Curated annotation (Swiss-Prot):
It comes from Ancylobacter novellus (strain ATCC 8093 / DSM 506 / JCM 20403 / CCM 1077 / IAM 12100 / NBRC 12443 / NCIMB 10456) (Starkeya novella). Homodimer. It holds the Pfam family Ldh_2. Its EC number is 1.5.1.49. It catalyses: L-proline + NAD(+) = 1-pyrroline-2-carboxylate + NADH + H(+); L-proline + NADP(+) = 1-pyrroline-2-carboxylate + NADPH + H(+). This is Delta(1)-pyrroline-2-carboxylate reductase. It is an enzyme of class 1 (oxidoreductase). GO terms for molecular function: pyrroline-2-carboxylate reductase activity.
Length: 341
């Protein structure tokens, strides 16, 4: 097996930007996606990292996504913001809307941002991290393609439907979790397939409805929700609030308009942000200290780690050592870029 190719984070960004521009994507979108992928790789979130570049390029070349669409920000009310992504990729739309969301939440105490008509492929923790670093509690929800069966079923009806929550953490490191409501993200299963690995039991069923550990069969069949009916209910919640609530597509509707190029699905994204300084009563420092105590007491128990701790550790390693890219993936990306086109 060929040795992995080691790249600095700056080289990851350049690789992404150059590959996307060579495919015909506009500079602003290419830079935003490059930032998104680089953040994912820095935190060793490979399912949303360089591997996703293949899908982005496919959607540019197929004409599915608008290459030069500039997102438009509008204010429905002082606390409700909207970004029309105009059939473009989500990262630039997120970068357009989140600063306004932060400002509105700090002014009013609570604010929401709906992003419409976007192709979303990125990790949600990165979407809300700026708001949490600004001292806000924040949530984010998005709907994916129809590939998950509801609890007890075997036919896809729901998306992987991830959501994220963040809280301003101690030492400037926010408490953020981000996970799919399926047993695993579809990207994780795709990486298992590419690597020739099995998936754990309970993640999916094959096209015949029988449980499977074959990732190819899982992708052809249906993923399962985590936690049975609990994960299924949470997935439906995400469908409702990131779909009909904001006037965007459900996962089933998204799949119906999908062209099969392997790129990101079309849909919407909902953000909610609350400023503890405005929203709560009593002394803010005391309330934040109560939260810090909760984190400290949890970590004091052997075997406990908080969400996002591993990402921050990975981030420190990546800044120093760069990242390792599987040789086969690097060769595939090189073929997509300026040298291969």
């Amino acid at each position: 097996m060929d040795e992995p190719v080691r790249l600095s984070l700056a080289e990851v960004h350049v690789l992404c930007r150059d590959t996307l521009v060579a495919a015909g994507l506009g500079e602003e979108h290419a830079q935003a996606i490059a930032r998104s992928i680089t953040r994912a790789e820095a935190d060793e979130c490979h399912s949303h990292g360089l591997y996703r570049l293949i899908g982005y390029v496919a959607s540019v070349r197929s004409g599915k996504a608008e290459r030069h669409a500039l997102p438009a920000l509008a204010r429905a009310t002082p606390a409700v913001l909207r970004v029309d992504a105009k059939h473009g990729f989500a990262p630039l739309a997120v970068e357009t809307g989140v600063p306004a969301l932060i400002a509105a939440a700090k002014e009013i105490g609570i604010a929401a941002l709906a992003i419409h008509d976007c192709y979303h492929f990125s990790a949600l923790w990165a979407d809300i991290e700026p708001a949490v670093e600004a001292g806000l509690a924040a949530w984010c929800f998005t709907v994916g393609q129809c590939c998950v069966a509801p609890a007890g079923g075997t036919t896809p009806l729901l998306g992987t439907n991830p959501f994220a929550f963040g809280w301003p953490g101690p030492s400037g490191r926010p408490f953020i979790f981000d996970f799919a409501t399926s047993a695993a993200a579809r990207g994780e299963i795709e990486l298992k397939r590419r690597g020739g690995e099995k998936i754990p039991p309970g993640w999916a069923v094959g096209p015949d409805g029988a449980p499977t550990t074959d990732p190819a069969a899982a992708l052809a069949g249906a993923l399962l929700p985590f936690g049975g009916h609990k994960g299924s209910a949470l997935s439906m919640m995400v469908e409702l609030i990131a779909g009909p609530l904001i006037g965007d597509l459900t996962s089933r509707q998204s799949k119906a308009v999908e062209n099969g190029d392997g790129g990101p699905p079309l849909g919407g994204e909902l953000f909610i942000a609350i400023d503890p300084a405005v929203f709560g009563t009593g002394n803010l420092s005391s309330r934040l200290a109560d939260a810090d105590e909760l984190f400290a007491l949890a970590k004091a128990q052997p075997g406990v780690r908080l969400p996002s701790e591993r990402r921050y550790q990975a981030r420190e390693r990546s800044r120093t050592n760069g990242i390792a890219v599987p040789a086969a993936l690097f060769a595939e990306l090189q073929a997509l870029g300026p040298r291969g086109s």
